Amino acid sequence: MPLVFFARVADVSLGTFRTIVIFRGHKFLASFIGFFEIIIWLVASAQVLTNLDQWYLALAYASGFSVGNYAGISIENRFAIGNELIRCISFNRDVLAGKLREEGFKVVSFDGDMGEAYPVELLLVIEKRRNVPSLIQLIKDLDPTAVYSVSDVKSVYEGPDIFPRRSLLHSTLMLLGKR
């Protein structure tokens, strides 16, 4: 019974992770994961199907499926594969973009308004998912009135290197919450 449960947790976790990786455009990694996913699934399914008189194996199989979905999503969140687009509206014009650039983020900014009385700055930042929490925290710290949204980006073409790059040490410190 534990074999069926844990095999099912493993194969569904891999399947969930594989599906998310496919969505992010990593075909080779998804194929590699799928190979191991199906082997584990065959072992778990064979145990249940050859012992249909043991109802608790079906229960372990179903429970493993449920836990595997949660585990797969958690694993993918931990790896934080891919990029995200952060759109930010700042009411403190010409402040936030400069500070974010000083911290090493690649920022595109536009001046705008929300009516005559509300000049704003619209910021666009494409950032690796693992760095987004520190970027959001920085936005909140620098401009608590800022409005932002975050969306997935399937692929990014970086083009010419016109933005300064952050060092690995700087990125690591940002991830740990130290600036």
Curated annotation (Swiss-Prot):
Q: Where are the transmembrane segments?
A: 28-48, 55-75
Family matches, as HAMAP family: UPF0316
Instruction: List the cysteine pairs that form cystine.
Output: none
Where does this polypeptide localize? Cell membrane
Its membrane topology: Multi-pass membrane protein
Q: Which UniProt keywords apply?
A: Cell membrane, Membrane, Transmembrane, Transmembrane helix
Q: Which InterPro entries match?
A: DUF2179 (IPR019264), DUF5698 (IPR044035), UPF0316 (IPR022930)
NCBIfam families on file: PRK04164.1-2 (NF003191)
Pfam families attached here? Answer: DUF2179, DUF5698
Organism taxonomic ancestry: Bacteria, Pseudomonadati, Pseudomonadota, Gammaproteobacteria, Alteromonadales
Q: What is this protein called?
A: UPF0316 protein Ping_1367
In the UniProt record, does the keyword NAD occur? Answer: no
The UniProt record lists the keyword Membrane: yes
What organism does the UniProt record list as the source? Psychromonas ingrahamii (strain DSM 17664 / CCUG 51855 / 37)
Query: Which Gene Ontology cellular-component terms appear in the entry?
Result: plasma membrane
Recorded family membership: Belongs to the UPF0316 family.
